[in-house]
């Protein structure tokens, strides 16, 4: 990183949220504690470390904080792509508070949270209109995005295929009812992809999430106007693809926005902090509040407003089944989170190192 004072107009071109120095007290306090450090943004995350940048053209391999190398250090407290950090030379000295994020419960038996991307304005949930089209997976992504501070936009790629058009129309109607934007595009066609421009203005940051083979890397290349990201063909029998993107990376776009491409994620576990109403099920939650019994399971109870809506053809029964499944998963994850918090508090009281716990980030 440069030893000159921060160039805030240039930092704005990679997503810096203010025209000058930070305007939030928490950021100001960290700046004051590190007067010799300069701000930079994490633009790549690898298993072996990070790459950070303070301009769209220049980046350096960054030395992470020593505590981030400890196996039991909470994963959510390590930097993620999109994070803002303070650096002295090539060394990260502080992680600045996140303004928004998208995260998931990490794979495995033990409770951890994984930050997928930080300080983002928009989450593009990418799904192909092919054999991999899965409305239930879209709902799961919407749940993870909800409450994180970023706006979800569902992007259906391979719009030139018509086999799943009827299913897509049903999803469109459900999303429109909740004011969640949906755009169908041909990821290889610049004119078609132009439909995403409203969310890719100067200084904005968006992240692409979705399964392998959904077209995220193809979409990235079209937005860039060049073949920067490697793409692979998908299997014809199930439309699944290999992991083209192997690590998360933030890429400046010609529009002045920044785009974060991510590898396909096979497992999308809730963290226990999700709000079903904010995560794509506001209509179901509103109906559930009208049920006769507060603990209604929406199966066969008398006075169930959710079942009545299903019987009237106003709700998709498969969507309600997914809602109930996700509600159980969120409750289970919330119990694990509470246990971790309790262990953390006991560890602090005893003077022992507390158990790792991923606490909610600042939004």
UniProtKB/Swiss-Prot annotation:
- Molecular function in Gene Ontology: GTP binding; GTPase activity; metal ion binding; rRNA binding
Quaternary form? Monomer. Associates with 30S ribosomal subunit, binds 16S rRNA.
Identify one Pfam family in the record: RsgA_GTPase
Role played: One of several proteins that assist in the late maturation steps of the functional core of the 30S ribosomal subunit. Helps release RbfA from mature subunits. May play a role in the assembly of ribosomal proteins into the subunit. Circularly permuted GTPase that catalyzes slow GTP hydrolysis, GTPase activity is stimulated by the 30S ribosomal subunit.
GO BP of this protein: ribosomal small subunit biogenesis
Q: Bound how, and how many: what does the cofactor note say?
A: Binds 1 zinc ion per subunit.
Region annotation (Disordered) ranges? 340-363
Keywords from UniProt, A to Z, are:
Cytoplasm, GTP-binding, Hydrolase, Metal-binding, Nucleotide-binding, Ribosome biogenesis, RNA-binding, rRNA-binding, Zinc
EC main class here is hydrolase
Which cofactors are required for activity?
Answer: Zn(2+)
Give GO cellular component annotations, separated by semicolons: cytoplasm
The primary site where this protein sits is cytoplasm
CDD domains, alphabetized: YjeQ_EngC (cd01854)
Q: What is this protein called?
A: Small ribosomal subunit biogenesis GTPase RsgA
Q: Which family does it belong to?
A: Belongs to the TRAFAC class YlqF/YawG GTPase family. RsgA subfamily.
Per the UniProt entry, the Enzyme Commission number(s) are 3.6.1.-
Q: Which Gene3D superfamilies match?
A: P-loop containing nucleotide triphosphate hydrolases, Probable gtpase engc, domain 3
Presence of the UniProt keyword Disulfide bond in the record:
no
Q: Where in the cell is it found?
A: Cytoplasm
Q: Which residues form the CP-type G domain?
A: 112-268
Residue numbers binding Zn(2+): 291, 296, 298, 304
Report residues binding GTP.
157-160, 210-218
